[in-house]
């Protein structure tokens, strides 16, 4: 079983575009801009059409038209992220890492002010020059997958990762991630900061971790991208992606396929793209469908994150065991999508039975916190656990049955079909 909540993002529109660096011909170029934060109302709709077509009609050498492309990408970036410092100007950094004909691919980052609780925001973009202007899509959007499927710039395993259709937010009430903690399985690191915002505000999408061998690793397989120095994003399946910031010695990647546990860098205090950091750590954030989402309620490394009374508080739960801020989190590895963790709601053992209900004989027990594999589910007697009351029972891979009330599955429904 499981449960949680959500928060929308604000919209802003840029003005006063200033192109600082332009490289029109190579395969990778970077453009930095500065923008005020005046709200332009109706002008925003004119600049950023619902169709995603932005900017003047491109010339034949569309992908080399860096100023128009950069303006289009920047307009979309600043209208889709919440800029946290009122009245401030924000630098943006658009890097075109690949281009060919009418197509361009790269990263767009809104740099953060160098202050506490500030973090950069950004997206991976793909753009196509159409007669009406540049069509720009960001990772996690449905249009991104559509363009990635058509673009000659995206091939092989990367295309598979980028063309996965977005799922409903929080996977439609499904909080399974299939992720390990972002360090080696079997190590214990300290939770130095409980759930908090990527940029200091809601949603509380991120946690801070440090310790062990200080090597930061991919939480799940996917396609990896360098957003800026010290910041890596990995795009996974099921609409999820993960961000890793403040890294030292971070890898330089442009869509490389990485496996779960792949080296991304070391914990550090890097703030190349803004913000601040005290003491080496990794700022680990969870995204879905092009937006940061609350990390609370999701399982990472077989721990279920939970908010506290304020940002940076809270902790995580494995079975009935609780670990608050300052405690160690042991990386149990990824919980499979048809697996569950026993939560006896206070410790002790969970009785296994011969059928879906207490009317069936006991055939053994399971310790709190162990991982089980679910074969199928059926309705039986009703029970109340940590996450509520349910009549659902799960048949385990050994043929025995347990009440779903005492398992964390991430879903309030069968995770492997009905028996």
Predicted regions and their residues:
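Secretory targeting and sorting signals
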Residues: 1-3, 20, 27-63
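Short, non-transmembrane alpha-helical segments in secretory-pathway proteins
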Residues: 64-93
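SH3/SH3-like beta-barrel superfamily modules
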Residues: 118, 365-410
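Short beta-strand edge/turn micro-motifs at domain boundaries
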Residues: 122-167
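Surface-exposed, glycine-biased beta-strand/turn segments
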Residues: 148-231, 315-348, 353-354
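Acidic, glycine-rich catalytic/binding loops that coordinate metals and/or anionic ligands
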Residues: 179, 210, 280-339, 404-419
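Short, well-structured beta-strand-loop connectors
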Residues: 215-225, 252-268
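Zn2+-dependent peptidoglycan hydrolase active-site motif and core
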Residues: 218-251, 272-281, 382-393
């Amino acid at each position: 079983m499981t449960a949680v909540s959500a928060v929308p993002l604000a919209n802003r529109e840029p003005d006063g575009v200033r192109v600082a660096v332009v490289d029109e011909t190579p395969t990778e170029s970077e453009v930095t801009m500065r923008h005020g934060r005046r709200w332009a109302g109706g002008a925003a709709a004119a600049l950023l059409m619902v169709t995603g077509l932005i900017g003047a009609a491109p010339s034949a050498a569309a992908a080399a038209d860096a100023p128009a492309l950069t303006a289009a990408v920047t307009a979309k970036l600043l209208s889709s992220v919440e800029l946290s410092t009122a009245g401030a100007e924000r630098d943006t950094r658009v890097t075109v890492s690949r281009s060919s004909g009418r197509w361009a691919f790269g990263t767009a980052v809104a740099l953060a002010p160098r202050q506490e609780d500030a973090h950069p925001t950004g997206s991976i973009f793909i753009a196509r020059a159409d007669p009406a202007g540049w069509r720009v899509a960001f990772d996690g959007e449905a249009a991104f997958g559509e363009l990635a499927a058509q673009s000659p710039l995206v091939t092989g395993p990367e295309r598979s990762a980028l063309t996965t259709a977005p799922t409903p937010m929080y996977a439609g009430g499904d909080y399974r991630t299939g992720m390990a903690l972002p360090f080696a399985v079997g190590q214990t690191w300290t939770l130095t900061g409980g759930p908090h915002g990527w940029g200091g505000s809601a949603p509380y999408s991120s946690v801070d971790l440090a310790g062990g061998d200080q090597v930061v690793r991919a939480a799940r397989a996917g396609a990896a991208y360098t957003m800026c120095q010290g910041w890596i994003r990995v795009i996974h399946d099921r609409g999820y992606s993960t961000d890793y910031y403040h890294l030292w010695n971070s890898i330089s990647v442009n869509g490389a396929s990485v496996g779960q546990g792949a080296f991304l860098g070391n914990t550090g205090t890097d703030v190349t793209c803004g913000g601040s950091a005290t003491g080496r750590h990794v700022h680990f954030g969870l995204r879905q469908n092009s937006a940061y989402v609350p990390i609370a309620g999701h399982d990472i490394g077989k721990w279920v994150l939970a908010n506290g009374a304020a940002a940076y508080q809270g902790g995580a739960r494995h079975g009935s065991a609780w670990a608050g801020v300052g405690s160690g989190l042991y990386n149990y590895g990824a919980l499979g999508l048809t697996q569950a963790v026993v939560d006896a709601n206070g410790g002790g053992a969970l009785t296994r039975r011969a059928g879906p209900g207490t009317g069936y004989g006991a055939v053994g027990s399971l310790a709190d916190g162990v991982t089980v594999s679910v074969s199928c589910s059926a309705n039986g007697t009703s029970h109340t656990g940590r996450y509520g009351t349910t009549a659902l029972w799960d048949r385990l891979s050994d043929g025995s049955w347990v009440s779903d009330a005492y398992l964390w599955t991430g879903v309030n429904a069968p995770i492997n079909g009905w028996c």
